């Protein structure tokens, strides 16, 4: 339970009761908390789905907007920052890996990063509108959960790019953790079959960052979570349209 609280504090901006804010967190406990990332995804998903449902009582477009605002607010735009950093680095590197890594280390956001954030938010808004209109609130709970299985796989599979978050987490994730969350994903896919594309998206992003960067970093995790969330929203939307037309 301690690991879940640590993960919740790290991945969200949700207010915590005073006793939970005083939990002592050392490097080992912080690393072990990664096992709980998918569970935190369920909390995020529940908040997003709740906002979508409440907004949809007025109009499905308001539901989509409310869901997006809560999604960004609850996570503190943590993963959008990683997406922006990688977009800036990829855009400025011109296929030069050393320059890519140098730009990645720059904390400032450039034009490529701004464009990436805008496109990501617009994509989510459009897809959320489709899902809210279809009353797919259960899928909204599960998408953030499924996307946060990705960091466990990348941490176990890929070498850390530098001595940062990825390096801390690597020693704490093992096959048992992956098997447990894979079983949970399979159970979730029974209710939302569109989640079956999750392994493909996770493997695609891992292959991409290994080829482009040579390993995984905190920015790689954040960008991957964002892109997989959007990919899963798209999968749910397409699956819903296919079911509706057959």
From Swiss-Prot:
Residues annotated as signal peptide: none
Required co-factors: Mg(2+)
A GO term, aspect molecular function: adenosylcobinamide-GDP ribazoletransferase activity
GO cellular component: a single term: plasma membrane
Keywords: Cell inner membrane, Cell membrane, Cobalamin biosynthesis, Magnesium, Membrane, Transferase, Transmembrane, Transmembrane helix
Residue stretches spanning the membrane: 37-57, 64-84, 100-122, 139-159, 185-205, 223-243
Pfam family, one: CobS
EC numbers for this chain: 2.7.8.26
Subcellular localization, as worded in the UniProt entry: Cell inner membrane
Enzymatic reactions: alpha-ribazole + adenosylcob(III)inamide-GDP = adenosylcob(III)alamin + GMP + H(+); alpha-ribazole 5'-phosphate + adenosylcob(III)inamide-GDP = adenosylcob(III)alamin 5'-phosphate + GMP + H(+)
Family: Belongs to the CobS family.
Entry protein name: Adenosylcobinamide-GDP ribazoletransferase
Organism: Novosphingobium aromaticivorans (strain ATCC 700278 / DSM 12444 / CCUG 56034 / CIP 105152 / NBRC 16084 / F199)
